[in-house]
């Protein structure tokens, strides 16, 4: 039962984070960010947000720095939008799955040539 609730909250957070990052964050370091997944622990105390960023490695690091500086604001916005007793602590991580998928697709395409 707790896993179902955690999954529902993760999906709601993913939706709200997408809107917050696109409309509310004014930091120039935060460029085009896509929230690919959110994992919330069963006790709803921590949330791991997976993001994808367009750009080179420097742009990715700048975006992560900007998001870490805005973490308090983002958490308060989530708290205002989703009614929870305690808003989960947010950590941002890069989603490497997209890059790995592209790399595998390139390898498979080269094999077929």
UniProtKB/Swiss-Prot annotation:
Alphabetical UniProt keywords: Cytoplasm, Ribosome biogenesis
Listed GO CC annotations: cytosol
Source organism (scientific name): Oceanobacillus iheyensis (strain DSM 14371 / CIP 107618 / JCM 11309 / KCTC 3954 / HTE831)
A molecular function GO annotation: ribosomal small subunit binding
Protein name: Ribosome-binding factor A
PROSITE patterns: RBFA
Gene3D superfamilies: 3.30.300.20
Subcellular location: Cytoplasm
Family the UniProt entry places it in: Belongs to the RbfA family.
Subunit and interaction comment: Monomer. Binds 30S ribosomal subunits, but not 50S ribosomal subunits or 70S ribosomes.
HAMAP family: RbfA
Biological processes, Gene Ontology terms: maturation of SSU-rRNA
Chief site of localization: cytoplasm
Cited function: One of several proteins that assist in the late maturation steps of the functional core of the 30S ribosomal subunit. Associates with free 30S ribosomal subunits (but not with 30S subunits that are part of 70S ribosomes or polysomes). Required for efficient processing of 16S rRNA. May interact with the 5'-terminal helix region of 16S rRNA.
Cytoplasm listed as a keyword: yes
Domain of life: Bacteria
